[in-house]
Amino acid sequence: MILRLLLALNFFPSIQVTENKILVKQLPRLVVYNNEVNLSCKYTHNFFSKEFRASLYKGVDSAVEVCVVNGNYSHQPQFYSSTGFDCDGKLGNETVTFYLRNLFVNQTDIYFCKIEVMYPPPYIDNEKSNGTIIHVKEKHLCPAQLSPESSKPFWALVVVGGILGFYSLLATVALGACWMKTKRSRILQSDYMNMTPRRPGPTRRHYQPYAPARDFAAYRS
């Protein structure tokens, strides 16, 4: 009898510890190729007619709150982020799914789900799970292959552009030839003008110094 009582006393605390904690399961790893990912958190607790809070944290120490939802199952609550993440979500039967969009490569990290029962008392939350490593791959843009139907307008534009380019080249050559011909005629005309005889200009005359004529008759008288 005493042995049964001791076993019962040892059994009840273990039940209480289990009931005060929510077990959460997550996938160990997710690879993101298109900057979007859906992370599901499965829990073992009945949230019917209870106020709860489900949140997603980033980092080994869960320092960044990525996305959160508050409410109950009587209405569909809204998911939101106070740290700049583009997030949404959905509540299911024993599952909370977080939709993360527009993720960047530098947001590759480990993410933890946290489930809390806020009301009625007592407050219950989950044991910290192993988390999910979200690996965001760099997005490479591949050139789209043109279908035969969509390539027809492209080749039509190429043909029209080629014809216009050919006529533009002909016009440029013709204008260049006219310009060279005009320039050559101007050069020949200039050379002809330089070869015509010109009237010599006035020459400078050298005058002898003036000396008055002597009157020899005056000396004779």
Swiss-Prot record:
Quaternary structure annotation from Swiss-Prot or TrEMBL: Homodimer; disulfide-linked. Interacts with DUSP14. Binds to CD80/B7-1 and CD86/B7-2/B70. Interacts with GRB2. Interacts with PIK3R1. Interacts with PRKCQ.
Cytoplasmic side: 175-221
Intervals, Extracellular compartment: 21-153
Transmembrane segment boundaries: 154-174
Cysteines paired by S-S bonds: C41-C113, C67-C87
Entry-linked InterPro entries: CD28, CTLA4/CD28, Ig-like_dom_sf, Ig-like_fold, Ig_V-set
PTM notes: Phosphorylated by LCK. Dephosphorylated by PTPN11.
Compartment list: Cell membrane
Protein name per its UniProtKB record: T-cell-specific surface glycoprotein CD28
Iron listed as a keyword: no
Carbohydrate attachment residues: N38, N72, N93, N106, N130
Gene behind the chain: CD28
Pfam families assigned to the protein according to its UniProt record, in alphabetical order: V-set_2 (PF15910)
UniProt signal peptide: 1-20
This protein's UniProt keywords: Cell membrane, Disulfide bond, Glycoprotein, Immunoglobulin domain, Membrane, Phosphoprotein, Receptor, Signal, Transmembrane, Transmembrane helix
Keyword Ribosomal protein in record: no
GO biological process: immune response; positive regulation of interleukin-10 production; positive regulation of interleukin-2 production; positive regulation of interleukin-4 production; positive regulation of mitotic nuclear division; positive regulation of T cell proliferation; T cell activation; T cell costimulation
Protein topology in the membrane: Single-pass type I membrane protein
Ig-like V-type domain segment(s): 29-138
GO cellular component assignments: external side of plasma membrane
Entry function: Receptor that plays a role in T-cell activation, proliferation, survival and the maintenance of immune homeostasis. Functions not only as an amplifier of TCR signals but delivers unique signals that control intracellular biochemical events that alter the gene expression program of T-cells. Stimulation upon engagement of its cognate ligands CD80 or CD86 increases proliferation and expression of various cytokines in particular IL2 production in both CD4(+) and CD8(+) T-cell subsets.
PTM sites of type Phosphotyrosine: Y192, Y210
Residue numbers bearing the Phosphoserine modification: S190
